[in-house]
């Protein structure tokens, strides 16, 4: 997500954390929803919008260890997002909220002729492979495979993700 947008507004309510954002060139849209059921504990007293810099947030989250318990709290008085990582030690980071105009982005109703389910690391690896050749990729779905392709003036690359137990 942070590859496309830097500053974002998360809309948080008792059921979910939602992000809808456009990249600066108005070419790509991010539509992300994280349901409350994904958390061990989730408490929201009232719906709130929180604007943050994703790169700064990501830098904090990268400090998390597998054994850490992550707690995120909004401090409205100090205008900060408190991020706590707790295991053997308790590490607390306070991320300043930013002021942003809350633009409503209409999510288009799209229908796709194909549905592919796979593990995210497989897509990540394929995209990283394509990055060697080009800054853009194409996804091509065939009957029993998903292809991730890239080409430049001189080079091209292709990764095939065949239909199996993981795709």
Where are these regions (language model features)?
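DNA polymerase sliding clamps and clamp-related checkpoint/processivity subunits
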Residues: 1-2, 8-132, 140-167
